[in-house]
UniProtKB/Swiss-Prot annotation:
This is Peptidyl-tRNA hydrolase. It holds the Pfam family Pept_tRNA_hydro. Hydrolyzes ribosome-free peptidyl-tRNAs (with 1 or more amino acids incorporated), which drop off the ribosome during protein synthesis, or as a result of ribosome stalling. Catalyzes the release of premature peptidyl moieties from peptidyl-tRNA molecules trapped in stalled 50S ribosomal subunits, and thus maintains levels of free tRNAs and 50S ribosomes. It comes from Lactiplantibacillus plantarum (strain ATCC BAA-793 / NCIMB 8826 / WCFS1). The gene is pth. The active site is at H19. PROSITE patterns: PEPT_TRNA_HYDROL_1, PEPT_TRNA_HYDROL_2. It is an enzyme of class 3 (hydrolase). The lineage of its organism: Bacteria, Bacillati, Bacillota, Bacilli, Lactobacillales. One of its GO terms (cellular component) is cytoplasm. Its EC number is 3.1.1.29. GO terms for biological process: protein quality control for misfolded or incompletely synthesized proteins; rescue of stalled ribosome. Monomer. Coiled coil: none annotated.
Length: 185
C-alpha cells in the first residue's frame, strides 16, 4: 500500500493559494485515477484507488498545514503504511516557481507541515515531491504563501503540476523512486 499526501490548508479562502499546491496536485491525481475524496475519522479527506492490485491512499489533511502530522500519523498507523511508502507533495519557498524536486528523505527544511509529519510519524525517511513557489521579494512570507498565484505565475505552476503528476505516476508504476528522481530532478 502507498499513501500520497498533498499538503494544504482547509477552507475556501485558501483554495488556489501557493501553500495549497499539494492539495491541487492530489486533487488532479484523484481525478486521473477516477476516485473521490471522503471525510475520514482521522481529520483528513481520503480517496482510495487501486493500481495493478496495489491499494493507494490519497490524503488531504483536514488540519491546518502546520499540524498535518496529526492526520498523517494516525492514518499511517491505522493502515500500517511504512514510511518508505509515504510520499508527500508540498510547496517549497526555496525552489524557483515551477521547479519540481523529488527527495527520498531528510529534514523538514523549514517547512512546518513536513516538520509536523516527521514529529507524528517519528521518521523522516519518506518521499517528497517539492514544488517551487519561489521566495517573496517584498512581502511577508505568510502573506505570500497564503496568496493566490498571479496570472503570470499560473502557467509556470501548471507546468510544475504536470511534471509533479508525471513523477508520482512513474513511482506508482515502477516503485523505483531513485530512478524517478534521476528522471525528474
Amino acid at each position: 500500500m502507498k499513501m500520497i499526501v498533498g499538503l494544504g490548508n482547509i477552507g475556501r479562502q485558501y483554495a488556489q493559494t501557493r501553500h495549497n499546491v499539494g492539495f491541487m496536485i492530489v486533487d488532479e491525481l484523484a481525478s486521473k485515477l477516477n476516485v473521490t475524496f471522503q471525510t475520514s475519522k482521522f481529520e483528513a479527506q481520503v480517496a482510495t484507488a487501486f493500481q495493478d492490485g496495489e491499494k493507494i491512499l490519497l490524503v488531504k489533511p483536514a488540519t491546518y498545514m502546520n499540524d498535518s502530522g496529526r492526520a498523517v500519523g494516525p492514518l499511517m498507523s491505522y493502515y500500517n503504511v511504512d514510511p518508505a511508502d509515504l510520499l508527500v507533495i508540498h510547496d517549497d519557498l526555496d525552489l524557483p516557481l515551477g521547479k519540481v524536486r523529488l527527495k527520498q528523505k531528510g529534514s523538514a527544511g523549514g517547512h512546518n507541515g513536513i516538520k509536523s509529519i516527521i514529529s507524528h510519524v517519528g521518521d523522516q525517511h519518506f518521499k517528497r515531491v517539492k514544488v517551487g513557489i519561489d521566495h517573496p521579494q517584498k512581502m511577508s512570507v505568510v502573506d505570500y504563501v497564503l496568496g493566490k498565484f498571479t496570472p503570470a505565475e499560473v502557467a509556470k505552476f501548471d507546468d510544475a503540476k504536470i511534471t509533479a503528476l508525471a513523477a508520482v505516476e512513474a513511482w506508482l508504476a515502477n516503485d523505483d523512486f531513485t530512478a524517478v528522481m534521476n528522471q525528474y530532478n
